[in-house]
Amino acid sequence: MLTKRIIPCLDIKNGKVVKGINFVGLKEIGDPVEIAKIYEEQCADEIVFLDITASFEEREIIGELIGRAARELSIPLTVGGGIRSINDFRRILASGADKVSINSAAIENPELIHQAANEFGVQCVVVAIDAKANESGSSFEVYIKGGRENTGIDLVEWAKKCEKLGAGEILLTSMDKDGTKTGYDLKMLNAVCSAVNIPVIASGGCGSISDIIEVFEKTKSDAALFASLFHYGEATVDEVKEELIKNRIPARIIKKEII
């Protein structure tokens, strides 16, 4: 089993970290960069900044925030929200991000995935997919615009297309599970993980360390992304990793020297 990544996600609105349930009822938590620095100290493998209103309200992510984060963090930073063109990719990467996450724009212009992969490399291209079960519960459908618009597109088919176009990894969020703290959507994750050969990041629903252990034991997810568990002090990244290792799930832990 490859080393599993633990990735705190900071949902950002108006420059502040927020967290809600099922994409609504948002509560402001704090400064993105200061929170990210705490997670890095706790041994987070990467950080994700998602501007959750940028796509819907057609606002661009503030480059200054990205630049400040890039200067103060040494772990990889993925940035998403409001990415609509190859120029947006160029601007975000130039500001200091290591990867760019696209969601709505990938659906509206799938060629953007291919174009970005060719120009910047597949390692820079993350396709974020928000999905939920259809009415019958037999399959999953893709949503865009911050989860406000149902595209009617089948999740598994879209994930396969993203891989073919050049996506380096998929960030898969279950809208049914997001913010509920009831565990990851294992059925959704298994459906996608079994259909693609690129890394899949599990997102939506983490409420305890046992949920993280479960997602790695019961799916082929390469990484786990979460917010609520960390933002409200219910667990730390290093506590999560220690439990993973106890359960024979490989995780990176850097022990700091005591001077």
Curated annotation (Swiss-Prot):
Disulfide-linked positions: none
Catalytic activity reported: 5-[(5-phospho-1-deoxy-D-ribulos-1-ylimino)methylamino]-1-(5-phospho-beta-D-ribosyl)imidazole-4-carboxamide + L-glutamine = D-erythro-1-(imidazol-4-yl)glycerol 3-phosphate + 5-amino-1-(5-phospho-beta-D-ribosyl)imidazole-4-carboxamide + L-glutamate + H(+)
EC number(s) on file: 4.3.2.10
Enzyme class: lyase
GO molecular function terms attached to this record: imidazoleglycerol-phosphate synthase activity; lyase activity
Catalytic residues (UniProt): D11, D130
Pathway stated in the Swiss-Prot or TrEMBL entry: Amino-acid biosynthesis; L-histidine biosynthesis; L-histidine from 5-phospho-alpha-D-ribose 1-diphosphate: step 5/9
Keywords: Amino-acid biosynthesis, Cytoplasm, Histidine biosynthesis, Lyase
CDD domains: HisF
GO cellular component terms, A-Z: cytoplasm
Chief localisation class: cytoplasm
Quaternary structure note: Heterodimer of HisH and HisF.
Functional description taken from the UniProt entry: IGPS catalyzes the conversion of PRFAR and glutamine to IGP, AICAR and glutamate. The HisF subunit catalyzes the cyclization activity that produces IGP and AICAR from PRFAR using the ammonia provided by the HisH subunit.
Family statement drawn from the similarity comment of this UniProt entry: Belongs to the HisA/HisF family.
Protein known as: Imidazole glycerol phosphate synthase subunit HisF
Gene it is expressed from: hisF
